[in-house]
């Protein structure tokens, strides 16, 4: 789950309800946000929920608040240096289910150095990155625990942001081993297109618009979760 860009009343409550319903990872993405507001939202989450939250900004808060990971993107390309080759992230559901997917926090440990802190060892963060082409995906795949590829379908949250890949391109990437369990589909994801995502070999999905811009975000999340 990727958050809305803005902060809004009741956001933490909705997030916590989604965790209760089986949310695996939260990507906290608030472009241009102030550190105080960012920290305040994190502090409204439980320690467990923070351990499953990946930061897109204010990376130095990750070790301080025991966040689950940090995410590189075009706004913050490489504020850290991934160390060594990253093996495939572990996709094991801690609730004993066979849901698609769940990146267990017991997956590969990370060592990175952010702007103010070193962070390594058994409680270290997951490292992820956004990719918008198959070439980017190939270049970054070995360096990160998992990678977003987008937009797969026409974006719901960004009007006019159309799917970038043909079905044939994605099937070829799957058959060549480029798309596998480390790759997360983003962009236009709904419960209705989950079967296509499965066929294309993705390890999971990241959603934003189909949940947050619906009349009932928690209900929409639950429907999506049941389709996995």
Where are these regions (language model features)?
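A short acidic, helix-capping loop that chelates divalent metal ions and anchors anionic groups
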Residues: 153-159
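Aromatic (phenylalanine/tyrosine) cluster motif
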Residues: 78-80, 91, 100, 112, ...
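Non-cysteine beta-strand/loop elements that form the S-adenosyl-L-methionine
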Residues: 146-153
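Long, intrinsically disordered low-complexity tandem-repeat segments
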Residues: 105-122
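Cationic, low-complexity basic patches in intrinsically disordered or flexible, solvent-exposed regions
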Residues: 82, 86, 91, 95
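Glycine-rich S-adenosyl-L-methionine
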Residues: 166-172
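Conserved N-terminal beta1-alpha1 strand-loop-helix module at the mouth
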Residues: 1-71, 75-77, 124-144, 165, ...
